[in-house]
């Protein structure tokens, strides 16, 4: 329970803040303001199931090493909507893209934006590193993940496994909050987390939870995956919403966590043609890094 603690706010602008050309500004105003605010928001509400009101909205900068040989990293901004019992975790850019594509003619509009951003060398601003929406404690005692394998919408539900945290004495300040360190071996990686008892919600990014306070920062021991909070807000946090982006024809296919991870890593595709048919390309030969979960 959040209680009466005061949450200080460090707002992050919705877009990246990079300089844009006048043409880009006009296009973004037309598509985003008219298309998103007028058209997308009702669709988001219509295509989402409210679990409960959100107490907090936190944003994290995710960094992932996608080539362990060169050390190349990609980054993404992810949103954590935390309620009293449940939470939702997803990419800001993914939500924008899925919301836009759900509109009438949204697929065509999204392609136009992709072409525009590609010409300007800014395609990463419209793409996400993940297709996952992760819902903690929905249903009760479980974690549900909705994602896509290629173009196939899939869903799997797993027991909400509690990382076995060891609390440490180290302390540092993040966004003005005093945070303490904890460590845990979880899903094949050793994780370090920094949490604050000033915000007594036992949640965090991805599938990390179970500490005496909100997790502000987390990373694995190899620094291949990391999450750093960049903003926290208790004002107008909205709802913890379970989104349904299936188009009515392709409902979510139920899979297991292990099957999803094997498919995502390319192990289920015995040749490139099958992978191509699934819309994944030859992921088995292209992947140069380990998945976040290594216990599959």
Q: Locations of the language-model features?
A:
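Generic detector of intrinsically disordered, low-complexity, polar/charged segments
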Residues: 12-14, 32, 36, 45, ...
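Gly/Pro-enriched, hydrophobic low-complexity segments
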Residues: 180-243
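Structural motif
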Residues: 174-175, 186
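Extracellular or lumenal secretory-pathway regions
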Residues: 47-163, 168-171, 178, 192, ...
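Bacterial Sec-dependent N-terminal signal peptides
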Residues: 1-53
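Short beta-strand element of the conserved SAM-dependent methyltransferase core
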Residues: 34, 60, 182-184
């Amino acid at each position: 329970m959040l209680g009466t603690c005061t949450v200080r706010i460090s707002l992050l602008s919705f877009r990246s803040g990079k300089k844009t050309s006048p043409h880009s500004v006009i296009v973004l105003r037309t598509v985003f303001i008219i298309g998103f605010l007028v058209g997308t928001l009702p669709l988001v509400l219509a295509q989402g199931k409210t679990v409960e009101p959100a107490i907090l909205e936190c944003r994290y900068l995710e960094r992932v090493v996608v080539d362990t040989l060169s050390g190349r990293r990609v980054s993404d901004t992810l949103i954590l909507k935390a309620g009293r019992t449940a939470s939702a975790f997803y990419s800001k850019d993914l939500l924008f893209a899925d919301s836009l594509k759900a509109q009438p003619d949204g697929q065509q509009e999204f392609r136009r934006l992709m072409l525009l951003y590609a010409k300007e060398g800014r395609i990463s601003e419209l793409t996400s590193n993940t297709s996952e929406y992760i819902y903690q404690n929905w249903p009760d005692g479980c974690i549900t993940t909705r994602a896509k394998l290629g173009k196939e919408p899939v869903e799997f539900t797993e027991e909400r496994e509690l990382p076995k945290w060891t609390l440490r004495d180290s302390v540092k300040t993040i966004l003005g909050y005093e945070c303490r360190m904890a460590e845990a071996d979880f899903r094949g990686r050793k994780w370090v987390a920094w949490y604050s008892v000033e915000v007594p919600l036992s949640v965090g990014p991805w599938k990390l939870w179970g500490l005496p306070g909100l997790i502000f920062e987390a990373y694995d021991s190899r620094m291949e995956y990391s999450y750093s909070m960049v903003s926290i807000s208790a004002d107008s946090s909205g709802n913890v919403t379970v989104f349904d982006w299936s188009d009515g024809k392709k409902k979510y296919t139920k899979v297991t966590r292990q099957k999803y991870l094997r498919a995502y890593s390319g192990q289920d595709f015995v040749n490139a043609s099958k992978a191509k048919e699934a819309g994944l390309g030859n992921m088995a030969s292209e992947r140069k890094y380990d998945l976040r979960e290594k216990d599959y």
